[in-house]
């Protein structure tokens, strides 16, 4: 696995300042939630930091990355390219950043679209992405408060 400091530096260069700041906030929110629910804080931090690592890529770059790693998108992802960065982010995390923990990879992969049977880590990243402190939309406070009731 790539050293955390190097990973952080790389992300700060490839992501916009706003996206990088969002990723940092997600990682901190994820750590806070992991502490609440007994989930590994290191995995929560890493998944939160990396979750949007492919967000800067164009559609064509994401398609090319998937082909390079022989990955096939499901129909929903192809129909909604705005969520494609989650699958590609998991590929980058695995093949370019050296993450081999399937729990972290799945938390990245499913941070945009929930699935049946999500792990606690997956739920944490899914919620932290929506509820981190920079987010400002109708209903965000309700999401933040609902965390106290459990995952």
Where do the PLM segments sit?
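Non-catalytic interface/linker regions that flank or bridge core catalytic/transmembrane domains
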Residues: 1-3
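Divalent metal-dependent catalytic cores for phosphoryl transfer on phosphate-bearing substrates
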Residues: 6-13, 36-151
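A short, charge-rich alpha-helical start-of-domain segment used by transcription regulators
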Residues: 17-19
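N-terminal glycine-rich anion-binding loops that anchor highly charged ligand groups
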Residues: 22
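Short, well-ordered amphipathic alpha-helical segments that serve as non-catalytic structural scaffolds
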Residues: 29-30, 89
């Amino acid at each position: 696995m790539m050293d955390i400091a190097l990973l952080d530096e790389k992300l700060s260069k490839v992501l916009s300042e706003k996206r990088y700041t969002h990723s940092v906030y997600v990682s901190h929110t994820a750590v806070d939630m992991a502490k609440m629910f007994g989930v590994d804080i290191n995995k929560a931090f890493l998944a939160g930091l990396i979750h949007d690592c492919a967000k800067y890529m164009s559609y064509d770059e994401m398609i090319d990355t998937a082909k390079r790693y022989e990955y096939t998108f499901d129909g929903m992802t192809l129909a909604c390219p705005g969520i494609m960065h989650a699958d590609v982010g998991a590929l980058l995390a695995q093949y370019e950043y050296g993450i081999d923990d399937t729990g972290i990879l799945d938390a990245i992969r499913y941070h945009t679209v929930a699935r049946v049977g999500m792990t606690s880590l997956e739920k944490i990243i899914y919620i932290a992405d929506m509820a981190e402190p920079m987010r400002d939309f109708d209903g965000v406070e309700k999401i933040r408060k609902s965390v106290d009731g459990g995952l």
